[in-house]
Amino acid sequence: MARVTVEDCLDHVENRFELVLIAAKRAHQLSSGGYKPLLNAGKDKPTVVALREIEAGLIDSSILSEIYVIDEQLSAQQKVLDSVKMSEIKDELSVTAVDKVIDEITEIEE
């Protein structure tokens, strides 16, 4: 295939900085195996495939906001899990504290 150039990709994005962000995010998606290439990847590495997809107009800056929304949802879920874990830890500590008091009372009585 012909070489993909930055100039060709810039026709589809605002500037070079946005191009880097979009290409990096897409390459990470491809390399992690969570997403399939939208073009025939052949033997190209994920970075090249990402740039080819941008050049073809298949991937744009919306990929960045989609990831942000998913990250926010995961963050909210993590906060709920953290609060559940914290309450379990507090319950465990309160039981341990009661056991310790009972042990101390038993020692005094002996």
Swiss-Prot record:
Coiled coil: none annotated. It holds the Pfam family RNA_pol_Rpb6. Its EC number is 2.7.7.6. SMART domains: RNA_pol_Rpb6. It is an enzyme of class 2 (transferase). GO terms for cellular component: DNA-directed RNA polymerase complex. Keywords: DNA-directed RNA polymerase, Nucleotidyltransferase, Transcription, Transferase. One of its GO terms (biological process) is DNA-templated transcription. It catalyses: RNA(n) + a ribonucleoside 5'-triphosphate = RNA(n+1) + diphosphate. It comes from the Bacteria. One of its GO terms (molecular function) is DNA binding. Belongs to the RNA polymerase subunit omega family. This is DNA-directed RNA polymerase subunit omega. It comes from Vesicomyosocius okutanii subsp. Calyptogena okutanii (strain HA).
